């Protein structure tokens, strides 16, 4: 049910909840300087819009019209800009909408190719890599010049392209090709292609750029690739390390901020598997919720939050204790999450109900704070914090 159609009693209850919490328990909320700004940007695939949430005041700021079917979003780490990938129609071309975060308006549109579906930025925030699922390619976009500067051919239906922290490796998951393409982004040369990963999905690259992990979403495994580099004075090529057995339908990998374990959301097994990335071993598997589709680890590496698409509950799991702490009621069809910059709020995107559930993360108050309506079929979110000059 869409939040806009909730009965008035529900909306009144949400309002009282927000007022009560804000008035009585605000010790976990930061004190912001006057020039501080923070916004969460939510792509609404069914509306062709981006909902801008004012994080400081925890309210909807505005809706921005972007391109058709926005599906992904990224924030510049160095400039006050946000980039929205518009997938477009099935047979048409997509684009990137550039949002000026200081004024929250669209300032440019960068044309792409057929059905772009993901975006990743290099550490400097100057180059974007966009997977074009309908063109079997990856676009390389100069974000300062606001134009495509290269295009790499990859496998069939690429769904994600991730750049390593050292910017020396681009890892592309080809869903329909059941494969992973490894590219030298400086030259566009394909270094390796690894098959045998049914429904290859969004990769994770370790912070030291040594390994890539790719969930095989149409199977029950995670592919582990050792990325090219030097061991002593010897150059090592990209190589397949192993295929690890996890649950059925692994769709998302959540890496701890410290680069330690990885948590695999097994959507068809209703479970999460813990992976030790140094040894390529699968530890325990935990029953977690109905159709877990995304995980997010807290900044202190202690908690795992899991969005369950079919249960309307967010699961909270203690990594240190190895146990489920409980759950928080959110909206329908939870599909994406993002922390506020201070980590005191977790924004949960609810695709079916068309809203964002705002959850307080402090142990004393861990609960739903409020619900913010968005456009139709929201699907991705990013947080951007900065100080005005």
What residue ranges belong to the model's regions?
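Bacterial N-terminal signal peptides
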Residues: 10-22
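Predominantly soluble domains enriched in secretory-pathway, periplasmic, or organellar proteins
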Residues: 24-389
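Bacterial N-terminal signal peptides that target proteins for export
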Residues: 2-12
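Intrinsically disordered, low-complexity regions enriched in Ser/Pro/Gly/Gln/His and often acidic
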Residues: 2-3, 17, 208, 258
């Amino acid at each position: 049910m869409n939040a806009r159609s909730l009965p008035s009693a529900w909306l009144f209850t949400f309002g009282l909840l927000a007022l009560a919490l804000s008035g009585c328990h605000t010790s976990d909320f930061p004190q912001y300087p006057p020039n501080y700004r923070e916004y969460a940007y939510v792509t609404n695939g069914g509306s062709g819009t981006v909902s801008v949430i004012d994080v400081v005041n925890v309210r909807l700021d505005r809706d921005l019209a972007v391109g058709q079917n926005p599906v992904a979003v990224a924030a510049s780490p160095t400039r006050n800009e946000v980039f929205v990938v518009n997938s477009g129609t099935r047979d048409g071309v997509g684009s990137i909408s550039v949002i000026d975060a200081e004024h929250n308006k669209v300032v440019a549109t960068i044309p792409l190719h057929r059905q772009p579906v993901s975006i990743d930025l290099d550490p400097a925030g100057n180059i974007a890599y966009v997977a074009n699922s309908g063109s079997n390619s990856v676009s390389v976009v100069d974000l300062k010049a606001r134009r495509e500067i290269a295009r790499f051919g990859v496998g069939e239906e690429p769904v994600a392209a991730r750049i390593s922290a050292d910017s020396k490796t681009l890892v592309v998951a080809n869903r329909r090709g059941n494969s992973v393409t490894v590219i030298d982004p400086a030259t566009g040369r394909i270094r390796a292609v690894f098959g045998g990963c049914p429904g290859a999905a969004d990769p994770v690259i370790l912070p030291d750029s040594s390994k890539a992990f790719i969930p095989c979403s149409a199977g029950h495994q995670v592919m582990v690739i050792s990325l090219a580099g030097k061991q002593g004075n010897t150059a090592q090529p990209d190589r397949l390390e192993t295929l690890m057995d996890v649950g059925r339908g692994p769709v998302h990998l959540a890496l701890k901020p410290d680069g330690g374990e990885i948590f695999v959301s097994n959507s068809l097994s209703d479970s999460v598997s813990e992976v030790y990335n140094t040894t390529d071993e699968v530890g325990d598997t935990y029953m977690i919720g109905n159709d877990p589709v995304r995980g997010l680890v807290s900044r202190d590496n202690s908690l795992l939050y899991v969005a369950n698409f079919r249960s309307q509950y967010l699961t909270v799991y203690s990594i240190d204790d190895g146990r489920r702490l409980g759950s928080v009621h959110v909206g329908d069809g939870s599909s994406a999450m993002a922390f506020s910059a201070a980590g005191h709020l977790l924004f949960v995107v609810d695709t079916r109900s068309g809203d964002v559930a705002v959850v307080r993360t402090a142990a004393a108050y861990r609960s739903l704070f409020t619900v913010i309506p968005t456009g139709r079929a929201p699907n991705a979110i990013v947080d951007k914090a900065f100080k005005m000059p």
